[in-house]
Amino acid sequence: MTRFACFLFSTLLLSFSYAAITPTSPLSIGQTLSSPNGIFELGFFSPNNSRNLYVGIWFKGIIPRTVVWVANRENSVTDATADLAISSNGSLLLFDGKHSTVWSTGETFASNGSSAELSDSGNLLVIDKVSGITLWQSFEHLGDTMLPYSSLMYNPGTGEKRVLSSWKSYTDPLPGEFVGYITTQVPPQGFIMRGSKPYWRSGPWAKTRFTGVPLTDESYTHPFSVQQDANGSVYFSHLQRNFKRSLLVLTSEGSLKVTHHNGTDWVLNIDVPANTCDFYGVCGPFGLCVMSIPPKCKCFKGFVPQFSEEWKRGNWTGGCVRRTELLCQGNSTGRHVNVFHPVANIKPPDFYEFVSSGSAEECYQSCLHNCSCLAFAYINGIGCLIWNQELMDVMQFSVGGELLSIRLASSEMGGNQRKKTIIASIVSISLFVTLASAAFGFWRYRLKHNAIVSKVSLQGAWRNDLKSEDVSGLYFFEMKTIEIATNNFSLVNKLGQGGFGPVYKGKLQDGKEIAVKRLSSSSGQGKEEFMNEILLISKLQHINLVRILGCCIEGEERLLVYEFMVNKSLDTFIFDSRKRVEIDWPKRFSIIQGIARGLLYLHRDSRLRIIHRDVKVSNILLDDKMNPKISDFGLARMYEGTKYQDNTRRIVGTLGYMSPEYAWTGVFSEKSDTYSFGVLLLEVISGEKISRFSYDKERKNLLAYAWESWCENGGVGFLDKDATDSCHPSEVGRCVQIGLLCVQHQPADRPNTLELLSMLTTTSDLPLPKEPTFAVHTSDDGSRTSDLITVNEVTQSVVLGR
């Protein structure tokens, strides 16, 4: 097995590029087919260094490899003699080592002169070289990704559909549970389905935009096109207007992401569903999901919850029902027993019907005189839409959206004179009671006021500080929502305990799992660290950074709400003798590279330049696919684009991970994070902890052990014994050498993060490291570290004053 993996790895590295696949020139493992200008490449690849081989298309020269199309996603090959060939009947076939057909284009052609070529748009074409006719193309057989000018399609006459189908997981191209498609409604709209149930809906198309995705108007001009031909077929295309390399992908988690490559990294432009309100029908029929902080459901005016007790508990899927039934027949005689209530900033509901109408007034009249019409909207780029069924999947944006007018009984909007008289009488009678109790109430209020004013002022100050910053997309959760999600912070939901305070697992009403960090009053981390983490991480988006969803500031409570990482933190695997066997060398190496990419984004590629100052194993979280996510930005610092060094009078961090210049003088730079990464890298390789490890009589630490191992055997003996069976020795030795370069005493001798990632992703020559001189030794009883670093290290850091 190991020999095969080593052979396969080396074979894949020896890549030879071809211009076309012909009957006499098949494509074998180790060979690639390049587009004319070298934008795309087709070849064999193996996700996550497994034995399974697939034929795929990816962007050439972009690391990590971004696969945009897979031919044999349902049938991998596992032998090194597979090839992709043009058959005598003109079709494209994938053969395994036994020359059995694993995948084919599925059609035969009366052509023996065809060839397969890859265009600069990423489209794989089978072309008849005699006539020049395209016989088959990959753009008509999409996977999980749309490239510019490829398209989704639905032909209602034939039933033919061209859809997006998610991967089963991040590393498994098998079709997953999510499917994206375009409808043939007038106007069309996009859907993501999870199995047979709607998961997300775009809202109807309005000439240049989807009405349920306002960002397509404001931040990413006209990235889509929807066209309908004479046969009624609808085509949805992702256009390339501003970026040379861009894509739309349906992820294995059900997210639809539009990204572009800026020359260094992928930048996220659109990501839906992005919040609670985006999920289909979260508030049920006639329920309105309001994009407040946090998002919440409410009933339209004139409606009440169908199941009031469930509604109070935050279970909104039952929706709402009318308080007063409609009496429609009077409208035609002038007795307006029904009225229309306008609601602004709305994502138009599902189940709409298009009505030919020249103006908003005509749209109103067409609904007014139709007893079954429950609502209408006149939308620029569409015209008149009416609803004859329940209003489902409605959300209200803070900005943007459409005006929806809902039919109500006139009594819901006012009432008759008798009703006004009764109300006036009730008010008069109540006035005396109110005045009589006012004095007593005021006296009690004065007693309580002084006791609570400081808490309110503090809470308001924190909220005002945040609102004065640009924290768009950050939600302010209500304490009640968090309490429901975490089962009142029960011990069963507790994930761990750190210096920040306890961390709890929670589940929101829409089923989304979250992690909640609850600031402890005894924590050394206060308002500065809390605010710092919110302001920094809310402005960052990268696959290798943990995503903050929001916060809660209520009374003395201060909580941070994150996306939940099912595999917790890296230290729970690396330092656990039973679980470390689950992370073989390929997984460890992939995690190492992911962390480096996250640091490069922080240091160089984000719009903020950030030094983390607390990079350590316990601050690396792992999602369900073992992708690493850098977390805990409470100690991070921003620096200006041309300023690569700063200092501080308050030294914060974790013993063992702090660089010499930072621990001794308070000077920090991106090279400080490089040092911390080096320690982390050596921990991941060895499975040993910097704060607990020592060996021989001199009690040498992990850095000294790594140095001696590298000098004696190239670092191969430094590897955790539980990972040796799956390793590539030269790769391990290279990583040990990189780790030693990162922990050099002088910052100038350490690589920056751009150089670091290049070292980890190429086979270029490495500088020779010097023996590391900075070490934190562990005493015999462990007392030096046991009081400073907790066992699980969820958030604990050392604070040293100078």
UniProtKB/Swiss-Prot annotation:
Residues 20-139 form the Bulb-type lectin domain. Residues 328-410 form the PAN domain. It is found in: Cell membrane. Residues 273-309 form the EGF-like domain. ATP binds at L495, G496, Q497, G498, G499, F500, G501, P502, V503, K517. InterPro entries: Bulb-type_lectin_dom (IPR001480), Bulb-type_lectin_dom_sf (IPR036426), EGF-like_dom (IPR000742), Kinase-like_dom_sf (IPR011009), Pan_app (IPR003609), Prot_kinase_dom (IPR000719), S-locus_recpt_kinase_C (IPR021820), S_locus_glycoprot_dom (IPR000858). Residues 443-802 are cytoplasmic. Disulfide bonds join C277-C289, C283-C297, C363-C384, C367-C373. One of its GO terms (biological process) is recognition of pollen. The modification Phosphoserine is found at S523, S538, S618, S631, S691. One of its GO terms (cellular component) is plasma membrane. It is an enzyme of class 2 (transferase). This is G-type lectin S-receptor-like serine/threonine-protein kinase At1g61550. It comes from Arabidopsis thaliana (Mouse-ear cress).
